[in-house]
Amino acid sequence: MSDDIPLIDLAPLRDGLDGARQIASALNHALENVGFLIIVNHGVPADLIAQTFEEARRFHDQPLDVKHALRMNEHNNGYMAEGRYNVRTSRVSEKSVQPDANEAFFLKRERPADNPLVLAERRFAGPNIWPTRLPAFREKVIEYCDVVDAMARRLLPALALSLDLEPDYFEQFFAESQYSFRLSHYPPVARKEGLYGIAPHTDMNFMTFLPQSDVPGLQIATEPGKWRDVPYVANSFVVNTGDTLHR
């Protein structure tokens, strides 16, 4: 345990299904009793995580007019300025919440122009918007996304086993899967009621993988109304279940 947030070592997954069975029970406890976990030995290189954080800094260090030129498109890809979003519909949100004090750059799975979903103009499968003034930004971010996506897929058999399902159960739902990757910047703000970097919320997706930094601020609710700080664990990811898996 790490301050009551389960800490799970994914090293056994290197042994395939035998390893998945080793961590299934711990995964079941984490997801059914807490809803969050911290994973280590996940296979995502520490230097790749550090480089991706640096790419996020490079992006947000650009002048505001440059970022506005990359504003979000109809697929929710691109730049979202600070104060343009707040949470009002989540079951854990607050009535007095103000617009989030963060800016962010969003992207989704990179697909070629001849991809069937792109040709069909499927919502959220459309083009990403890439900055042109940041050499190697696109390549490094895609590399990171590919590695994290592969890590998440390695976790699926253990997740299925933790729910007493066949180990390949979730594969059918991820044959043509989607993800959303967010590079956020949280500027310093004054303490004020209803003002958050990002307001209390639940994620609508299947699972979220958040690489930890040594800057505090992230809190989770393990029980209704009971919030706690997430402890920093070097070279780890915080994982939370989304509304899709919850259902």
Tell where the protein language model's regions lie, with residue ranges:
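Peripheral, non-catalytic segments flanking oxidoreductase cores
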Residues: 1-247
